[in-house]
Design a protein with these regions (language model features):
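Well-ordered alpha-helical segments within folded domains of soluble proteins
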Residues: 59-74, 105-122, 157-171, 207-224, ...
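Active-site cradle of extracellular carbohydrate-active enzymes
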Residues: 238-266, 272-273, 279
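Low-complexity, Ser/Thr/Pro/Gly-enriched N-terminal "stalk/linker" regions
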Residues: 10-65, 71-86, 190
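Mature, well-folded catalytic/scaffold domains that follow N-terminal targeting or propeptide regions
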Residues: 26-30, 43-50, 106, 132, ...
Length: 386
């Protein structure tokens, strides 16, 4: 047994909580999956309730809705023959025709995230499965809509904007070997590159370089295009300039972050964990030392961090899934388990966003926490052989 400092729901009062390290997380995961697959989709195309913001965005959202559920389930179990999954996909299509949502094309909150997940699902469906054509039709419809809606998207970032959409379109191109989509991607990547080069000339802070809403996510998408589709020296050089800039910004911010960081400054979406993940996705050992230093820094301030994937401690754990640092990884898992309990359905649930343990959304709830604990890698990693 270990004792770890934890904090109660909405109070800033610390207490000691005993952690039972005998949890079999694979069994806990099976219990979670069985529960999810027992659920029906409601009239709003939701499987379970989200938080206030999650109820406002599209129910197919990766961050808050169906896409996150499907992605998790398709990686944790063979669900290609599961009738409940097909029911969800059919119900969503019948109920969401014509609906318009905030950031409705984005990879975290909209249809490009759904495209990404359906492409994952499609790869696992056998050719004689009667649902295969349904999935293909859905994929092609989303692809066409994204192409026609792309220019209406006003931002370039990964979570909300054009770079995240382009990553999903690249995945579509890999799966369907589509010449027209390749031409579209080539043109739009050049536009993204020109924006990126202009932005890195004017960077003044680490916050501008975060993964979800800043330049690291854009750099990642350009990097994927350059390594998997069409190499350009100019693209490679711009990435090198950005990486050097990012290293310098991290070094300059280390002392301040080592004294008074905020939760978001350590997170995936807006902080250091997202930047460390970006460095890990380069698969370049030269960044090992800086990754290690900032992982230790983030762990030092575990008490100010929530537990979830997007904004909390699970984003640090995601970076540790790329590193051979077993002790630190186990320590983070111990802390997350110290924030867990058994719910009325017998599921091991974790304190999530806003101190709630009832959220299952991938981005802010239990699915993302389980994902990191079970050692999985970044959901949006892309290679042709994958």
């Amino acid at each position: 047994m270990k004792y770890i400092n934890d904090f109660e729901d909405k109070n800033i009062e610390f207490h000691l909580k005993k952690v039972d390290s005998s949890f079999n997380l694979q069994i806990e995961n099976e219990t979670l999956i069985n529960y999810l697959l027992s659920l029906n989709m409601n009239r709003e195309s939701r499987i379970l309730n989200s938080n206030e913001f999650g109820e406002f965005v599209s129910p197919i959202s990766f961050q808050h809705g169906l896409s996150g559920y499907l992605f998790y389930l398709s990686h944790m179990r063979d669900i290609s023959e599961n009738g409940r999954i097909i029911e969800w996909i059919i119900s969503e299509g019948n109920q969401n025709k014509g609906n318009v949502y905030l950031n409705g094309c984005s990879i975290l909150f909209g249809s490009s995230g759904y495209l990404w997940v359906l492409l994952e699902f499609y790869k696992k469906i056998t050719s004689n499965n009667p649902s295969r054509e349904l999935i293909i039709d859905k994929i092609r419809d989303i692809y066409k809509d994204l192409i026609s809606s792309y220019q209406k998207v006003e931002v370039f970032d990964f979570a909300l904007g054009k770079s995240g959409i382009l990553l999903s379109l690249m995945k579509y191109c890999i799966n369907f070997n589509d010449v027209d989509s390749m031409e579209f991607i080539r043109e739009k990547i050049e536009e993204l590159y020109l924006y990126f080069v202009d932005e890195i000339r004017n960077v003044n802070s680490l916050k501008e370089c975060n993964f979800a809403h800043g330049l690291a996510g854009i750099a990642y998408v350009i990097l994927i295009y350059n390594s998997e589709f069409e190499f350009k020296v100019a693209y490679e050089n711009s990435i090198k300039v950005f990486n050097n800039l990012l290293e310098n910004l991290l070094e300059n911010e280390y002392s301040r972050l080592n004294a008074t960081p905020t939760n978001l400054e350590l997170s995936w979406c807006e902080g250091t964990s997202g930047i460390l993940l970006y460095f890990e996705l380069l698969y370049d050992k030269r960044y090992s030392n800086i990754i290690s230093r900032f992982q230790q820094l983030a762990f030092k301030f575990n008490l100010i961090q929530s537990s979830c994937y997007c904004h909390g401690l699970s984003s640090l754990l995601q970076t540790l899934n790329y590193q051979d640092k077993l002790n630190l990884r186990e320590n983070v898992i111990e802390i997350l388990l110290s924030r867990s309990k058994r719910d009325k359905n017998g599921i091991l649930v974790f304190e999530c966003e806003e101190s709630s343990d009832t959220l299952f959304d991938f981005g802010i709830g239990n699915l993302g926490i389980y994902w990191s604990i079970l050692g999985e890698r970044f959901p949006f990693e892309l290679k042709k052989e994958l």
